[in-house]
Amino acid sequence: MVLKKDIERRISELLKKMKAESIDVILSTTFENSSRNPKYLSNFSGSFAYVVIAPDKQCICSDSRYWEQIKDQSPLELVKYDRSNASHILKDLLNGYKRIGFEAKTTTISAFNDLKEKVGADNHEFVACDELINRLRMSKSTDEIELIKKAEEIAIESFVELLNEIKPGKTEKEMAAFLEYTMVKKGADKPSFDTIFGSGPNGALPHMFPTMKKIQEGEFIVIDFGAKYQGYCSDITRTVAVGEPTDEMKTVYETVKRAQIESEKIASSSLSGKEIDKVARDIITEAGYGDYFGHGLGHGLGLDVHEQPGVSAMNEDKLPQGAVVTIEPGIYLPGKFGVRIEDDIYITGETNEVLTPVSYTHLRAHET
């Protein structure tokens, strides 16, 4: 559980970064869960709020649907938003601050224009603050790690139950629904994302959502799934064999497994995302499958299922201590099958801790 001290620590760190960037105030907004930053800064999990952070003001503003929820969840001062102040509440909250930090990546053009109109563009300077908060979110606290571990536990236990349910003749949709239901039954808020479930040729589509296709004997199934617990995500992929795989399937599987193990083994705060990605990519390329591994090796994980830092050729920065990242190499042969294996790991410094201890040695459906 996220405690008051966690929120106070996050805000204290953010204020230091704001001072260094000469930002007077930050406005963090969520509308229909467009951003997880308000959750990070206030612990409020509802779908609409303005969170205002300045040296002399830390408050959360929302409408009557969420007043009691905010009182229960957040240590920040509640500012009530209603019909009487809707037209001027933002101007009141931001009055006196010159440089306003806002989330450029999740703010639509229309919302930004509306913000400038309500606050008064002539009196303020608007600067993107996304990276300030993203950098804070990369390194997880002990409490955050415990929540992620619980999300992993729920997902893993549910997956083990799923293995006994997968049989030829059942549909992809049926099996994905079983997995998602089981995760919620075991305590998840909800799935971290819509489950990816691709059997046979559908597994060659990296983000293939389940269809009414029936599972067949002799197929591989790529299952990418996760549970969300108290706002924090898990993200796991396993490739399951239904019956006996062919020699080609075994070769591809073993190649992906080796790429996964070797890149996971070296992941640490002394290496960049690019360097870790290269280890897995070189193994797959040397095996002759380089053209069939098109995505990055991994990504950060936390309140969002995809967040910083990236584990790919695009990220030349070293991974920060405290980050949780995925390691997920894959090979996808169009019209045949796909293989992906994904673990979540915690960067503890010069080493890491694997948070997803599920065997991936020739997982077989209905044989567990």
Over which residues does each language-model region extend?
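Active-site neighborhoods and metal-handling regions in enzymes and metal-associated proteins
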Residues: M1-R364
